[in-house]
């Protein structure tokens, strides 16, 4: 009786927040009512792509998506209880939304004539998860994620097995779900800021209403509030602006709109999703990798979620006669898939984070990252991508391969630039618990993205961006640009960006009022790599340049050679060359022990330079032509000792 009273009291309280205290948001400054600031980039790149020469095909087809998805399904089928729940093979418990994800995954595979022997497992997962959410017993209180998966799984199974009595059982349970009991992320008098959890719950409620098993009150109210969290670029801003949860939130909305959502906010959401899809394609690196930064960075599903969103966007562009972008989105999806394959495990499942450490080590994991739920999330993204894929759309050059442009994205404190197969990501004011201010990543077509550099450790622990530190007097402490993040008074601006003579030039200016220092970085992106010049104004005795040298991902160990001010790294037939051009620079030296970071282990390589200016280059060398995508490049004859 006490439990019932408590549940009823909570329901009344939540309903008070939902209805009695609901305040209609002021949408006059929402992103969808403002102009798209990067529309000119979209148009310029369209012209660039239309003039580009054809590139060799990736060879990726939708069956490849299904092959990986099926491998994951078969792996986790071995860990299903008799009662239907999916148990994590590492922790031996049910995590979050693993069970409803598994139900949808196998249903989607069955729809594509895959894994018929697993259909019983899907029914068991559907019944177990629907029973859990109906009785507010979702695993680890993650009920917000259940209906998005369960309603779609039920729709597929009902179409294939319309007379199965289990349909009625699952329908009855889903119909009984009370949103204010089942979900954690709700509008209440105490909670006015929503996040990605509520996007997913709202999408589940849309699908439930379309299936005739619910009503639209919940999703109408919450999606209206969610419109405030989109920028004019169509990007979703989760608390603290992690890059990964922008596309994550849009993925769920994209899938939901394919289900013919006709609610009050369809046009506004659709506009945001179209802009966001363009931004994601423009932000993609020449290695097919999504931008990184912030919480949950370097998780494999960050790249996988590009695939269904790009497949949907390809169809949308094709239907409008925009064949240039339709083909670019198609190839972008394939590049994203190709970048993911390296993280497959021989057991058929995926590494959760982009390294080859054993899952038991949880290397690079967030506290909420688990092998089961994130592997199965990746699998449903791939299976849905296959569902949305139109194989009649051919590949065409992508912006990162054949375009030249710069994106200034202040909501995520990022500047991203691509120039004909060379791409960089700059964090303008980092969340230093995760990243560092300055240059985060350099990717080139045909190169190994992990050598990139691809990621950096948290600057709070190890300031190790490709960047500068200075000291004000001999023997003084080194002050790193990377450490000047959200908690400091640093001010950053993209001072200039233009393209001429085959080079894209970007100038970044960082001002630190509290110390009186101004750091100016000039980047020159060329076909062969990046040249960078740095000048530090203010009290400066000497500079140190730091470089995060990747030393292991748990499986592959690059060969590393340092000769004076030149660092060469090679792995799997590709080579990276980092060299300091400034005269008077001390020889490069490895500092300290290796440091754990998301991609494995990294060591800091440094050089000290007298004065206040420094210049360096980062170039891609290729020891052998790469199969697959992109353009392999041989810069010159590199050391035979590598």
Please give the residue ranges for each predicted region.
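Low-complexity, Ser/Thr/Pro/Gly-enriched N-terminal "stalk/linker" regions
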Residues: 4-123
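Surface-exposed polar/charged interaction patches
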Residues: 7, 11, 15-18, 22, ...
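Acidic Ser/Thr/Pro-rich low-complexity disordered segments
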Residues: 45-57, 449-459, 627-629
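Aromatic-lined, polymer-binding surfaces characteristic
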Residues: 77-272, 284-308
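Short amphipathic alpha-helical coiled-coil/interface segments
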Residues: 126, 174-178, 273-280, 329, ...
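Generic recognition of long tandem-repeat/solenoid scaffolds
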Residues: 236, 415-419, 503-511, 567-569, ...
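Extended polysaccharide-engagement surfaces of secreted carbohydrate-active enzymes
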Residues: 282-587
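Beta-strand-rich recognition/accessory modules
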Residues: 579-642
